[in-house]
Amino acid sequence: MNEKTHNLQDTFLNHVRKNKTTLTIFLVNGVKLQGVVTWFDNFCVLLRRDGHSQLVYKHAISTIMPAQPVQLFEPEANGEEG
């Protein structure tokens, strides 16, 4: 890793936001939401679908599943996985 500490959560959310990746978000109460992240901060995520936006608090999120595979970092040159 380089000098900057990578925050996986922010890296993931920024990647799916920039690529407009459709996500399925499961909340802790079992509700399933789908849409595209248009904005996020330390406490919440703005999810957009069919022209409507939903502000979702991160503490209510259980799982985030992208519709397609996401590669956040380049594979290391030494051949190690993970």
From Swiss-Prot:
<dbReference type="InterPro" id="IPR005001">
    <property type="entry name" value="Hfq"/>
</dbReference>
<dbReference type="GO" id="GO:0043487">
    <property type="term" value="P:regulation of RNA stability"/>
</dbReference>
<feature type="domain" description="Sm">
    <location>
        <begin position="10"/>
        <end position="70"/>
    </location>
</feature>
<dbReference type="GO" id="GO:0006355">
    <property type="term" value="P:regulation of DNA-templated transcription"/>
</dbReference>
<comment type="subunit">
    <text>Homohexamer.</text>
</comment>
<dbReference type="GO" id="GO:0003723">
    <property type="term" value="F:RNA binding"/>
</dbReference>
<keyword id="KW-0694">RNA-binding</keyword>
<comment type="function">
    <text>RNA chaperone that binds small regulatory RNA (sRNAs) and mRNAs to facilitate mRNA translational regulation in response to envelope stress, environmental stress and changes in metabolite concentrations. Also binds with high specificity to tRNAs.</text>
</comment>
<keyword id="KW-0346">Stress response</keyword>
<dbReference type="GO" id="GO:0005829">
    <property type="term" value="C:cytosol"/>
</dbReference>
<comment type="similarity">
    <text>Belongs to the Hfq family.</text>
</comment>
<protein>
    <recommendedName>
        <fullName>RNA-binding protein Hfq</fullName>
    </recommendedName>
</protein>
<dbReference type="Pfam" id="PF17209">
    <property type="entry name" value="Hfq"/>
</dbReference>
<dbReference type="InterPro" id="IPR010920">
    <property type="entry name" value="LSM_dom_sf"/>
</dbReference>
<dbReference type="GO" id="GO:0045974">
    <property type="term" value="P:regulation of translation, ncRNA-mediated"/>
</dbReference>
<dbReference type="InterPro" id="IPR047575">
    <property type="entry name" value="Sm"/>
</dbReference>
